[in-house]
């Protein structure tokens, strides 16, 4: 495999991919259709991409015409690749990164009065097994509550889960509870899953792991 990051095009954006040191293959192709849907909501929008990794949703949003993107992740290496991807996509001036714990950054942004037209959260698996399910659902609810408070009236919130133990119904319920506890009314406008290159095996529940919920608030 190449030792240096390589550019990969997806949904009109360029992603810099570390094939050796990156998570999985360095880029999350399973999210491709959900990136594309988010991009449709992003024209002219100020976007917050939380747990951004190498810029998955944020760079897709800029390709869709977003005015500005703030990408938040705990990995400095991933954020550097995201920045390189923004430069390679010709949108470096509209792209900003912030390294830190996602929940802490969300709290800081709320305290500062920040608001966004589109907020997307794509965390790692909070419920990676059945024993972790209840704690994971509480984490999804907390994330939804904190993220919802940063969405402008009439804006959009995207919430993702890659936890196969948290099925769609449980994840959706936790997300809706969190949004409600933020004092926000919501309408679920889209439910997304993994792309066709990550098919679901009818006899393997673990293959139906990815869910993406998009709400209008």
Predicted regions and their residues:
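Non-catalytic substrate-recognition/targeting regions of SAM-dependent transferases
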Residues: 1-27
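Conserved SAM-binding motif I beta-strand of class I
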Residues: 68-73
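S-adenosyl-L-methionine
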Residues: 77-118
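Mobile active-site "lid"/loop adjacent to the S-adenosyl-L-methionine
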Residues: 116-146
């Amino acid at each position: 495999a190449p030792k240096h990051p390589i550019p990969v095009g997806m949904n009109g954006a360029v992603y810099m991919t570390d094939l050796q040191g990156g998570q999985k293959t360095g880029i999350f192709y399973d999210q491709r259709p959900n990136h594309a849907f988010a991009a449709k909501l992003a024209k002219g929008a100020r976007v917050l991409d939380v747990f951004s990794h190498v810029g998955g949703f944020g760079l897709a949003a800029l390709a869709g015409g977003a005015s500005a993107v703030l990408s938040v992740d705990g990995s400095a290496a991933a954020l550097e690749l995201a920045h390189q991807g923004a430069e390679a996509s010709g949108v470096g001036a509209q792209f900003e990164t912030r390294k830190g714990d996602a929940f802490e950054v969300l709290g800081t942004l709320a305290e500062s009065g920040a608001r966004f037209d589109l907020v997307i959260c794509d965390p790692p698996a909070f419920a990676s097994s059945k024993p972790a399910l209840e704690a994971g659902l509480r984490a999804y609810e907390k994330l939804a509550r904190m993220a919802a408070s940063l969405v402008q009236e009439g804006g959009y919130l995207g919430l993702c889960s890659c936890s196969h133990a948290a099925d769609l119904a449980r994840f959706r319920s936790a997300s809706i509870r969190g949004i409600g506890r933020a004092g926000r009314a919501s309408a679920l406008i889209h439910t997304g899953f993994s792309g066709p290159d990550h098919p679901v095996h009818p006899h393997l529940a673990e293959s139906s792991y990815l869910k993406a919920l998009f709400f209008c608030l």
